[in-house]
A protein has these predicted regions:
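Membrane-integral, polyisoprenol-dependent glycosyltransferases
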Residues: 1-344, 371
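Transmembrane helical bundles and short interhelical boundary loops of multi-pass, membrane-embedded
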Residues: 347-379
Length: 379
């Protein structure tokens, strides 16, 4: 017997609900001095000194991040004459909602509306995902572009891509790089071939990473690096390309952690839904449930990126943000297959994920409305 559709099953309703419940948090919290205020200061310094491609903080080079997010801060500073934290926070919240929409649209052929609701709300309320959706950082922007690139790859892989998708794929990859740096290319370049190897279709790499992808990526990066060199000279370009990439990967000068760091941080970074998503992700290994090609791809991306980032010297929990979506949605597809097979446990878990997520969002509303000081201490 089919269940009647509910209001919560509508993506537009869920998106509006997320926005309304997080609105007090967005309006009443204070900006953090270590990261958020620093980005505003970098934007002010760039506007004052006429820098556009090269970033500086208190006169010192700040090649840690590409300029895209700072450009957004600069744009609103120029338009409004002051910084508006609420508008800037939307450039984290809106990409988070777009990421949910992409994953729901992508997985709609394997997930019912009820399971899509559970998957997207549980992803939204993962600790680090929710936190990244309300702070002034570029991580969610990068996650959105990575998710778009993965969806575009899947359309190419399954023969559903339009001619434009062959150009959109490298464009999304570039925008991910331009948002956060080299971590933006790691999933499309390193994790996709892992999946293709397991599927014995490695030759498809020539279609995904063919001449169009490399041409557009080289052209856009070349333009960026040329203007960086023109404005900041060889020293800034060297800092951007080598010190901030190879230095962080091999012998990090910031956030250096042991190789097993993510083995324990992933549990609280995805909390509370790591307790469901991660164990369920291992079920196909034990033949408890069959994994479709889509699930295999999502899990291959999550597993390979986890291993790759564990081998990188510099580690922060938020670096795992791009794999939260694949993990949550893959686990929900597996749970729905179990429910279709008569599993009562899967039904219970779906309800826990749905109502637990709504409870977390309601708690965020109350805290933002009545206890903003406590929220500031958390961030």
């Amino acid at each position: 017997m089919e269940e009647k559709p509910r209001l919560i099953d509508s993506f537009l309703f869920r998106a509006a609900l997320i926005f309304v419940l997080l609105l007090p948090v967005l309006l009443r919290r204070d900006l953090t001095p270590t990261n958020e205020m620093k980005y505003l200061e970098i934007a002010d310094e760039a506007l004052r000194d006429g820098h556009f491609w090269c970033l500086f903080h208190n006169g010192e080079m700040y090649a840690d991040k590409p300029p895209l997010y700072i450009w957004i801060v600069m744009l609103f500073r120029r338009l409004l004459g002051c910084h508006c934290a609420f508008l800037l926070e939307l450039f984290s919240l809106v990409p988070a909602i777009v990421t949910l929409w992409v994953l729901e649209r992508w997985c709609s052929e394997e997930l019912s509306s009820r399971w899509r609701a559970a998957a997207s709300l549980s992803l939204m309320t993962c600790a680090w995902f929710l936190g990244s959706a309300i702070v002034l950082r570029m991580d969610m922007l990068m996650t959105m572009f990575i998710t778009l690139s993965l969806w575009t790859f899947w359309k190419m892989y399954t023969g559903r891509a339009t001619p434009a998708d062959r150009w959109l794929f490298p464009l999304y990859v570039f925008l991910a790089i331009f948002s956060k740096g080299p971590v933006g290319i790691m999933i499309p370049l390193l994790c996709i071939p892992v999946f293709l190897l397991f599927e014995r279709r490695f030759r498809f790499m020539g279609t995904v990473w063919g001449w169009r992808s490399w041409l557009l990526l080289a052209a856009l990066c070349g333009i960026w690096w040329f203007f960086v060199w023109r404005e900041g000279g060889s020293e800034y370009l060297n800092n951007l390309l080598f010190h901030q990439t190879a230095g962080r990967a091999v012998n990090a000068f910031h956030h250096k952690e042991p190789v097993y760091y993510y083995c324990y941080t992933v549990w609280y970074a995805m909390a509370p839904w790591s307790l469901i998503a991660i164990p369920v992700a291992f079920l196909p290994l034990f033949k408890r449930v069959e994994a479709s090609p889509m699930v295999r791809f999502l899990l291959a991306v999550a597993a390979s990126f986890f291993v790759i980032m564990s081998l990188v010297s510099g580690k922060i929990a938020v670096y795992l943000l791009p794999i939260f979506g694949p993990l949550c949605f893959a686990s929900c597809i597996l749970l729905q297959r179990m429910e279709d097979g008569g599993s009562r446990t899967a039904v219970i878990l779906r309800r826990i994920m749905l109502w637990g997520s709504l409870l977390i969002l309601a708690a965020a509303f109350v805290i933002g409305l009545f206890f903003p000081g406590w929220l500031n201490s958390l961030l």
